[in-house]
Amino acid sequence: MNSRAKPTMPAMQQPVLTDADLQTIMDRAFQSAVGVIIASNDIAAVIAHLRQALRPLAALVVNEQGGTPAEIERAAQGMAVRLAYELWNATPIPENHFRPRKLAPPERNAPCPCGSQRKYKQCCGAGNEGPLILPPDEMLGRVLDHLPRTRLGEPVAQGISPHMLALVASRWCDEQRFDDVIALLEPLFIDLGKLDERAADAANILMNCYLARQQYDARNALVERLKKSHNRVLRSAGLQREATVCSDRGDVRNAWRAFNEARHLTPDDPSLSHLEVLLLRAEGRDIEARERADYWMAVLAADPRHDNRALIEALHALVAEAAADD
């Protein structure tokens, strides 16, 4: 008979969640809750949904304190009630002209919405958590994610600002959702007479997506229309894009002609820095390109009006490319 004791199995441990895991849980919970808000128009349904979606997060918090399953449920319910009202009041509803349908949160002495019959301040409202940071463009993007592509033109029809649309489109472009960006932004440029410089970012993003989708005719048509805009910033945006198009096909003379016209219209536009260095690089004038890049990086770094970090990084990259080609 073997007298040796059998080895004991290690106790099961709770998986360790990273900050990224927690962010993923929250992001998925928020995204799905927005869908419930749009579909149900029922705060109770949103609370019930969030209670389930946030249970893993509640379990993590409670288990760290040696809590019980009942305490996990109470924690999940408390999170759900607080977050449901904040999400509700920040969610732009398509049928409400992409504005939230505001709903007053429970008063501190009112019965708690969870049904406990206790006062809100003694139940789900007992925490000291600060308000969520829910940027309007992020919430608009969450709502649009629940709409079919055929409805992505609705924000333009409802008067959502070009700046807001550009913020959403920029994220989608980073995610390579080019067709969604085109569906979102194309309606904005049907009537350029209504637009001013606030639409310039959206125009550049749309032209980038046309390029990514190899829709050259659509891009070139937008360039020509921008060049005829009554707004000098939009005209400059069209000319700057024309300069890159001409450079790509080896038309050096017209590339510089378009660049100089754009510079005349908007001499303080930081994006001219990158374009000038690109044109010099395209001609193989690498020494001049490095000199102009150094000049522009100093100018951009000293500019108090704009956050030029992305442009400076892009210029650094162009200089590095030029050095690698030597």
What is the predicted role of each segment?
Residues 1-326:
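Acidic/negatively charged segments and metal-coordination signatures
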